[in-house]
A protein has these predicted regions:
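Short, acidic Gly/Pro/Ser/Thr-rich loop/turn segments
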Residues: 7-9, 47-50, 87-91
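Generic secondary-structure signature for well-ordered alpha-helical cores
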Residues: 4-5, 48, 103-107
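Short hydrophobic-aromatic micro-motifs
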Residues: 1, 40-43, 79-84
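Short conserved micro-motifs at the rims of enzyme active sites and ligand-binding pockets
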Residues: 11-13, 52-55, 92-95
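Catalytic beta-strand/loop cores that center a nucleophilic Ser/Cys/Thr
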Residues: 22-75
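Cysteine-nucleophile active-site neighborhood
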Residues: 1-30
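Acyltransferase
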Residues: 71-114
Length: 114
């Protein structure tokens, strides 16, 4: 489980179009080059609070709120958790990369006898 607490608010914490800069920490190979900027959107009434410092993030917020006004895409194990919604378009082909990642993890687990 993510080491934090989801808190609901009366008003939206983040809403509208955002721009994300890739940090290079994304666990799905080839999702994007470090520093690449992607358009996306967010709309959420929740925030994630009480996270320990130093957890890696897949994205820095150029515009928008994300998880904390600075970052989005918390990386925890094999998971990328965030509030931003990315479209699968030519400059952000995340669906194919996700499927590749799942297949590689499955192969690794089968090879390890799991």
């Amino acid at each position: 489980a993510i080491p934090g607490e989801a808190v609901m608010h009366d008003r939206p914490v983040g809403r509208g179009y955002v721009r994300l800069r890739c940090t290079g920490a994304h666990p799905w190979p080839g999702v994007s080059e470090t520093g690449a900027i992607h358009p996306a959107h967010e709309f959420h009434y929740a925030s994630l609070e009480g996270l320990p410092p130093g957890l890696p993030h897949a994205y820095e917020m150029v515009r928008g709120h994300g998880l904390d006004g600075i970052n989005d895409g918390l990386i925890f194990g094999n998971m990328v958790a965030g509030f931003t919604h990315l479209r699968n378009v030519a400059n952000t082909p995340w669906v194919g990369r996700f499927v590749e990642f799942v297949r590689s993890r499955r192969s690794q687990m089968m090879a390890a006898g799991c």
